[in-house]
């Protein structure tokens, strides 16, 4: 009976150790798969947009950036400003505003509005109050 119990305990300890060792690998694979899918879905949505829609989205983002430059940073945006911010560059309605490619490590990571824990679990967060990532003189996009 003692051998049977010790065998069960040894098996549980082994499985626990194996789970702890495999968790980082499985977690990285899972996140990479979902990030790749998010980038692919976003790219498809952008390809479906006509040139006029793309230009309008870019113009709205540039206008937002210009407003930040002229008004200065605000620590507590109004509800209207929050709604506007969340709608900018959100082509597929998921909160994703673009993606960043890092060729050295062959990685494409989605960029989402905000820096809440839920956002940072799935991609890169854009800090509200900084310029949107569309470029331009005097703009400074901050990603987390």
Where are these regions (language model features)?
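N-terminal Sec-pathway targeting helices
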Residues: 1-14
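Solvent-exposed, non-transmembrane regions of membrane-associated and secreted proteins
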Residues: 14-144
């Amino acid at each position: 009976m003692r051998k049977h119990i010790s065998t069960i305990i040894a098996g549980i300890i082994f499985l626990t150790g194996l789970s702890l060792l495999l968790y980082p690998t499985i977690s990285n694979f899972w996140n990479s798969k979902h990030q790749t899918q998010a980038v692919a879905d976003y790219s498809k949505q952008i390809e479906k947009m006509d040139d006029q829609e793309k230009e309008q989205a870019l113009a709205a983002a540039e206008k937002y950036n210009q407003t930040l430059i002229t008004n200065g940073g605000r620590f507590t945006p109004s509800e209207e400003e929050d709604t506007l911010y969340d709608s900018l560059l959100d082509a597929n309605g998921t909160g994703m505003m673009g993606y960043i490619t890092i060729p050295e490590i062959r990685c494409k990571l989605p960029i989402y509005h905000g820096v809440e824990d839920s956002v940072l679990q799935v991609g890169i967060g854009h800090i509200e109050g900084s310029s949107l990532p569309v470029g331009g003189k005097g703009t400074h996009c901050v990603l987390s």
